[in-house]
Amino acid sequence: MTKKKKNLFLEKINTSDSKLIENECNDKESLQRNKTFNNLTAKEWARLSKPIWDDLSSPRNKFQMNHGAVFPVKLVERLLHMYSKVDDRILDPFLGVGTTLIGCQNLRRNAIGIELNKEYANIAKDWVESNYDLFNKRDDFCFKVVNDDCRNISKYIEKDTIQLTITSPPYADFIQRSLSDRENVHKKSIIKGENNSTIKQYSNDKNDFGNLEYQDFLKSIKHVLKENFKVTKKGGYSCWVVKDHRDTKNGIPYISFHSDLAKVAE
C-alpha cells in the first residue's frame, strides 16, 4: 500500500470512528431525554439550574407596559425548560397581561391563565393573538384566558391535569408602598430607564389580592394554593415568583414573604 493510499485509508477510519462516537453520544443523549420528565440531559439541567439567574432581564414591550409589575418572558421560558416538556399543560392563576402564556406559546406548551382584571385579561388575549406566526399556529396548541377570580380555579380546570404552574401573586398591599419607593428612590435606575419598568396599582376591586392587608392576603392565598395543588399532576411543579419586602413605616425592617408563603402552602 502506498503512503498516499495508507493516509487516505486512515482518514476514512478516523472519519468513521468520529461518526460512531457522535452516534454513540446522540444515542446516550436520547436515552437520557427519554428517562426525564422534561426531556433534558444532565448537562442541560446543570446549566439551567445554576443558583443565581442574572441573565433574564429584558425591556418591557407595549403589552407589559400596561401592567404594574411583570416578570420577563425569558424567566417563564427557563422554568418551562426545567419543569415541563412540549405539549404539557401550564397554569398561571394570576395571569396579568399574559407573560406566562407567551412563554408557553414560544415553547409549544398548552396554557390557561386566570385574571381578575378585565383590562389585563383583554391585553393578554391581544398579546397572544399578536404572537402567532408560521411557527405558532392557532390550531397547534391551546391558550386560554379566563377573566375571573383565581379562587375559582377548580371551575375551569380538572384535577391532576397541570404539569407546571408559573405565577407571581400580587404582593398584598406592598405595591402601594412600592409606588412611593420607585418615585423617590429609583427615579433614574436602569429598571425604570432601559427596561421600561413601571409600577402602578392593579385595581380598586375588593377581591383583588393586591388590595389586602398582609395577614388577610396570606389567609386568602391559602385557598388558591389548595386549589392549585388539586389541579396539579402527581410529580408536577409550582413556581411562584415573589420578593421579600421592607415596611420601615411601621417599624418592620424585613418581611420574609417567600418563607411566609411557603408556610401557608405546607
Model-found features: residue ranges?
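Class I S-adenosyl-L-methionine-dependent methyltransferase catalytic core
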Residues: 2-266
